[in-house]
């Protein structure tokens, strides 16, 4: 590896191997769907070697990822099967890793959004609830589904949402898009009590819209405006309007 390819990074700055890989990709503006696996593997291993020379405690998951990268790299070094037709589809050895990176990037953006929201939230003074006592709202914001179940279902949504491939560096969480999706969802629930998440996204054209709707669902759950229910694991999400004061 030449000096131009070396990226010296500090271990404490990363939460795990996917975080490190994503940083290497973003910092060099690499297309995540066309990762130069030899180059990235070399940079990844160079950083692990440097951390070891500094006697840093490196989690085992970093070495697991290293073996994964080396396995993918080795697959590119193997001779191609001459008996396979040129136009016959062969799965890209990087496909599974790319999927993990895309999913990690999406959830990273979501986490960053809520962290920013918490930091920007102004100090508020508590007041008596305006909701009628007869219409008690349960304190659990996600209704009959847990946060982990909701996150796992969203992973399934990402896998099923086979649209144009977004550049990871371009996946953004915009306040405006969340407001638009909040309005979109409220309009959906204006004349009926419930709708489904899959029904809402069926005509969406890009991943940003799906992320925006997901965040809008979380916002409305937190504000006790809707409940989220699920009839089976990884199934569709039923979004139900919470009626207060008879409205």
Swiss-Prot record:
One GO cellular component term noted in the UniProt record for this chain: cytoplasm
Cellular localization per UniProt: Cytoplasm
Alphabetically, which GO biological process terms does the record hold? cell division; chromosome segregation; DNA replication
* Entry keyword Cell cycle: yes
Q: Which organism is it from?
A: Lactobacillus gasseri (strain ATCC 33323 / DSM 20243 / BCRC 14619 / CIP 102991 / JCM 1131 / KCTC 3163 / NCIMB 11718 / NCTC 13722 / AM63)
This protein's superkingdom? Bacteria
Tell me the protein's name.
Segregation and condensation protein A
Q: Which family does it belong to?
A: Belongs to the ScpA family.
